[in-house]
């Protein structure tokens, strides 16, 4: 089976590929070799815009040899429409069915959603099977394209050993007098993420409260791109400004690599509250990381985030605060509510355990491949 993108850690966990010996990438441009996904082919933001995207799918030098099935998650957004058509035509000509998991109905990083919508529509209509993560997303896909997806809830991203290690290490990142540690996830600082304005809006959380700490979590390459050669000085300036004006006991910048979340897990586990400041979204893998590590998320009322987090449970009994992004004061109110009334994260729904998720995918693969 070929998987796009095969190297993405979330994808591998979602479909249970970590133990697989033969995982192939679906390269949507020439020159990608068998086995592992090169880093530059994982996300559209990391792709060379001058590269030729032919739509051909190669395994080593021989197209589609020994490939029975393709599973596409994401990573196709950078393609021109004719290249997406070429991918579909190439698969049809070779007689290789493909499964599509729709993580994002709206473009996850840019306001112009038309290219992503067109790409997704082309793939949805051609796929042998379509999967998504929530019932409300499945309904939206049916309304838009008349397809009836299989809903496979998001499984956990971390196993018990990883969770225990992160929690233990996270305790060493907090002092005995740190009653509140708030994280703000800026990800790649794309158009879908609120920036400095939101950091300013969080100032009331720390005012009049001793021992409130702020952690700004950002993807390392995005930070390097934003700050250029002055990235260290820029980071120190931002931290100093927020610490002085926001009243935080401390402010620290936490950078992570997109393909290696291991080092950032203790930082995440050390948080009491994590703000996910999306301007628009469909689902969020980071919500599932909060669930794994027992961190209370604060997120806006956009996309299907609320449905994903509170899937089939009572919001009043569990952690997680939803705020109105149109109200400048709402995010601080939500963070205060989350910190002053700590509750357990919602449990995962039936069918989200790793064994069931893997079994469900295996059944879908067999049906799509005609086996």
Residue ranges and their predicted role:
Residues 38-126, 135:
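Extended catalytic core of nucleotide-activated donor transferases of GT-like folds
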Residues 250, 265-282, 292-295:
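Acidic donor-binding loop of glycosyltransferase active sites
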Residues 322, 326-329, 333-371:
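A charged, aromatic-enriched C-terminal amphipathic alpha-helix characteristic of glycosyltransferases
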Residues 290, 296-306:
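Short hydrophobic beta-strand element within catalytic cores of glycosyltransferases
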Residues 31-32, 152-168, 188, 221-223, ...:
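Short beta-strand->alpha-helix junction loop in the catalytic core
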